[in-house]
């Protein structure tokens, strides 16, 4: 490796916008390493990070309010280029001598920005740009040493710049796809203004991760809880590439997986890629622990607790293992970082081996902790994992445990597995699978009357669920063709003995959540 992929870096200060992680993903997409920190970071931390440029994100607060967030003064004393986006532009203007006021007309949605003058930010772009606005306040006076470089009909200062100091501000969101040339603007800032090189690529990330794993664990043995999900699968491939047979994967079949999933995991990682895998058939143990429990959070906790017990027992048999590999990714790290003002993301309890007992006394190997999910998928492809595995729809950590409503029983799981497999198979056959963001089947523990032949029968009900979403924070139910839904329903009722009725969930998020439990 000729250059350290972390040598050139952008710091993004988070003021709370729903799009902030998207800014970071775009910078990574450009090929430059970046980190996302809360706006109230200490000067010493910025100095130590030593960024080549700083981006101030958007945010929900109003600069006109007392005690609203401000960028640390060091941002403007550091001598590095600064790019303020939406709220970031407003706080930049206010802090450097301009003025912000609440607008008479709020601007949400598409707008056209007329570019004026020549700016490095808009290099090689047309003089009219389609952009995405989302603001109630606006800059009404720019700082004395700034010039206007863009305006809309309702926003006189849609973009401003101090070319000498390399300070830029835009009132719109260049990070969203609705801003047609937003990525080019970010490229102009990151590559052009900040002078960064494209060192952050899938190949270089793999090379760096493998080198770091080797350095961290030396000749020690490592264990990994392999679920067959994207994160743990990519960790398995990376660690195996680094240390080969010194990695042992523990695959716990809890009886709550999709149809044939256990066999597929063993076949892919054991037979095809040659990893050491211990398969633990723990279906009976999990179902026994879940007996009589019908409350969703209690089910989650029970599944998590039993997984930890099983994994702990298996790890004790591997007495030489000194390291535990985990699939922690960058959004987990961001969510776990508490801001000193309490405004940062709260810690989320993830269903993974993060809850393992303290007495395991193992070091952690987390090769994905700098990566976003889309980056994890890209390096998974580079490592040889199949596309359809890396890009399949999300599956909850507790598995069918939260897709069987109420108490979980083997009979219910077996019926649900088969019904769900039919739904997914038909989505692929109709070329609809990649057109929806997530699709699955839910088992309802209620019997409904049906007619089969000359007789009536009371059998179970399942619900099909398919949604379209960009970020999973909000979602629309997918308008699947009636003919398609009819075909899926007929197949399930005819092929899965025990199901007499199929319904389709047409609830959006909000008010409903995507999963039923």
From Swiss-Prot:
Residues 9-199 form the Glutamine amidotransferase type-1 domain. GO terms for molecular function: ATP binding; GMP synthase activity. Keywords: ATP-binding, Glutamine amidotransferase, GMP biosynthesis, Ligase, Nucleotide-binding, Purine biosynthesis. InterPro entries: Class_I_gatase-like (IPR029062), GATASE (IPR017926), GMP_synth_C (IPR001674), GMP_synth_GATase (IPR004739), GMP_synthase (IPR022955), GMPS_ATP_PPase_dom (IPR025777), NAD/GMP_synthase (IPR022310), Rossmann-like_a/b/a_fold (IPR014729). It catalyses: XMP + L-glutamine + ATP + H2O = GMP + L-glutamate + AMP + diphosphate + 2 H(+). Its EC number is 6.3.5.2. ATP binds at residues 227-233. The active site is at 86 (nucleophile), 173, 175. Residues 200-392 form the GMPS ATP-PPase domain. HAMAP family: GMP_synthase (MF_00344). This is GMP synthase [glutamine-hydrolyzing]. It comes from Vibrio cholerae serotype O1 (strain ATCC 39315 / El Tor Inaba N16961).
């Amino acid at each position: 490796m000729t250059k350290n992929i972390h040598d050139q870096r952008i710091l993004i200060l988070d003021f709370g916008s729903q799009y902030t992680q998207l800014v970071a993903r775009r910078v990574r997409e450009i090929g430059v390493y970046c980190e996302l920190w809360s706006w109230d970071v200490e000067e010493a931390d910025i100095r130590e990070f030593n960024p080549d440029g700083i981006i101030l994100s958007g945010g929900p607060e109003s600069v006109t309010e007392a005690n609203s967030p401000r960028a640390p003064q060091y941002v403007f004393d550091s001598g590095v280029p600064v790019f303020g986006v939406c709220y970031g532009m407003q706080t930049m203007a206010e802090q450097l001598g301009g003025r912000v006021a609440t607008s008479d007309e709020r601007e949400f949605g598409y707008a056209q920005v007329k570019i004026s003058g020549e700016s490095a930010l808009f290099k090689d772009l047309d003089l009219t740009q389609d952009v995405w606005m989302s603001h109630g306040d606006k800059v009404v006076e720019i700082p004395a040493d700034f010039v206007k470089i863009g305006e809309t009909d309702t926003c006189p200062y849609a973009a401003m710049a101090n070319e000498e100091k390399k300070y830029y501000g835009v009132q719109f969101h260049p990070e969203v796809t609705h801003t047609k040339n937003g990525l080019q603007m970010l490229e102009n800032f990151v590559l052009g203004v900040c002078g960064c090189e494209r060192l952050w690529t899938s190949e270089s990330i793999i090379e760096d991760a493998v080198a770091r794993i080797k350095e961290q664990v030396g000749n020690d043995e490592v264990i990994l809880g392999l679920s067959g999900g994207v994160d743990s699968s990519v960790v398995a491939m990376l660690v195996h590439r680094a240390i080969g047979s010194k990695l042992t994967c523990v695959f716990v079949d809890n009886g709550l997986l999709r149809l044939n999933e256990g066999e597929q995991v063993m076949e892919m990682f054991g037979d095809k890629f040659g990893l050491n895998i211990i398969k633990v058939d723990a279906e009976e143990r999990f179902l026994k622990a879940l007996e009589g429990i019908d409350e969703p959070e209690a089910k989650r906790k029970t599944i998590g607790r039993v997984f930890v017990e099983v994994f702990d027992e298996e790890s004790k048999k591997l007495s030489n293992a000194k390291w535990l590999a985990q699939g922690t990714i960058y959004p987990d790290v961001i969510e776990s970082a508490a801001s000193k003002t309490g405004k940062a993301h709260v810690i989320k309890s993830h269903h993974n081996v993060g809850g393992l007992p303290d007495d395991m006394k193992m070091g952690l190997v987390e090769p994905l902790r700098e990566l976003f999910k889309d980056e994890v998928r890209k390096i998974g492809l580079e490592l040889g994992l199949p596309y359809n595995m890396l890009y399949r729809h999300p599956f909850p950590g507790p598995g069918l445990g939260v897709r069987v409503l109420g108490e979980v029983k083997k009979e219910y799981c077996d019926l649900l597995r088969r019904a769900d497999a039919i739904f997914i198979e038909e989505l692929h056959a109709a070329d609809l699978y990649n057109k929806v963001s997530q699709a699955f089947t839910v088992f309802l523990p209620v019997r409904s009357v049906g007619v089969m032949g000359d007789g009536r029968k009371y059998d179970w009900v399942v619900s099909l669920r398919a949604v379209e979403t960009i970020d999973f924070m909000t979602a629309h139910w997918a308008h699947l063709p009636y003919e398609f839904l009819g075909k899926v329903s007929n197949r399930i009722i005819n092929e899965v003995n025990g199901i007499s009725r199929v319904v389709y969930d047409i609830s959006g998020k909000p008010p409903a959540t995507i999963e039923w439990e």
